[in-house]
Amino acid sequence: MKTVFLTGATGNMGWAGFRELYRKRDRFKIRLLARPSRKNMKLLEPYAHDPAVEIVWGDLTDYNDVCAGVSGADYVLHVGGMVSPAADYFPEKTLEVNVTAAENIVKAVLAQKNADDIKVVYIGSVAQCGDRLWPVHWGRTGDPVYASRFDRYSVSKCIAEKIITDSGIRKWVSLRQTGILYPGILKVLSPTAFHVPIQGVLEWATVEDSGRLLANVVEDWVPEDFWNRFYNISSGEQYRMTN
């Protein structure tokens, strides 16, 4: 039975991924890293004594906590970190958390005796390539990284991605996620919504598709040439709805 270490499991994408992985608990042991907040402890309480789930209470910025999660893992799904709108209100903290988390993931993986066998999945962001204003509406994975210097979230994702891909980890992949469409998204009212240019375009990814992605990337049928590449992630043409 393989062990999957998942960070960010209590966030939108991470939770969807965890639920999909949990359906495969007869084949995978699931290890989660979560901050011991009241919200997280309540959310994960039903799994506290589940033999298929191991919860590491800790923080991405603490190397020992990250190492406890990585040790013995076959896959590392690094979804955790600070995202908008919190990232917009706390830009410097976002930079520190997201970069330090990537550094700790790399350090922990390379410290393992079986480091070459551990596959690392990093969740990046299409924000790394900047806004898609006319006439450049189409994004490709080969496009240059072009983050706004004032968008600390985007900058942090660029730096963190480079830390992962240039680390010497033998098998990695960067999945640059777009905006996640999840139930209740319209209830999140924040002035940061106006940071999105009115003439920009966006192809959403549903939270369900995002969860299936995380659960499928750990399957044996994933081809070898999938690894050591960059991918843009979305739910397809039918989700080109709004900016």
Regions found by a protein language model. Give the residues of each.
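Mid/C-terminal beta-alpha module of Rossmann-like enzyme folds, strongest
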Residues: 207-243
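Glycine-rich NAD(P)-binding loop of the Rossmann-fold in SDR/ketoreductase-type enzymes
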Residues: 61, 93-104, 151, 155-156, ...
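NAD(P)H-binding glycine-rich loop region in Rossmannoid oxidoreductase-like domains
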Residues: 49-97
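N-terminal Rossmann NAD(P)H-binding glycine-rich loop of SDR-like oxidoreductase domains
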Residues: 2-24
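Glycine-rich "substrate-gating" loop/helix at the edge of Rossmann-like oxidoreductase active sites
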Residues: 148-151, 178-186, 196-208
